[in-house]
């Protein structure tokens, strides 16, 4: 039981985070709950943030790779917006990143990391790369 919390999967490249979060977990959710999830790459955040924020379950791969976003002269941090609204609306987040918690804090700030800890279970992927 996840107690309504999503997942924040952290680890070096090649540890299996993307496969688990974009292939296996969505298959389980769709099969067992009849819910459809949309899977996005972090670079999609800039162009699709408004659409993404409307979903009940959101899977974002490779958090920390997205660039700065300016819309109508306004600087936005789509990932921070996503985390903020996910907390307010109860959106389930499934996230992967190669960044450490400290690197996430530097990139997005303490507020975002604190909210992430509140709404996700952090799972660390350790070991050697599974890629050949």
Q: Residue locations for each model-derived region?
A:
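The conserved Walker
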Residues: 13
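Phosphate-binding P-loop
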Residues: 1-4
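Conserved lysine of the Walker
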Residues: 17
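Hydrophobic anchor at the beta1->P-loop junction of P-loop NTPases
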Residues: 9
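Hydrophobic positions on the alpha1 helix immediately C-terminal to the Walker A/P-loop
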Residues: 20, 24
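AAA+/P-loop NTPase substrate/partner-engagement loops
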Residues: 26-66
């Amino acid at each position: 039981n996840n107690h309504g919390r999503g997942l924040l999967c952290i680890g070096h490249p090649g540890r299996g985070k993307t496969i688990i979060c974009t292939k296996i977990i969505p298959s389980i959710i769709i099969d067992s709950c009849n819910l459809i999830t949309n899977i996005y790459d972090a670079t999609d955040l800039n162009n699709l943030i408004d659409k993404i924020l409307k979903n009940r379950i959101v899977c974002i791969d490779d958090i920390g790779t997205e660039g700065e976003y300016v819309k109508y002269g306004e600087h936005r941090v789509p990932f921070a917006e996503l985390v903020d609204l996910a907390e307010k609306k109860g959106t389930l987040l499934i996230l992967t990143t190669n960044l450490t918690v400290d690197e996430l804090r530097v990139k997005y700030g303490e507020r975002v990391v604190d909210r992430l800890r509140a709404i996700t279970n952090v799972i660390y992927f350790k070991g050697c790369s599974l890629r050949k």
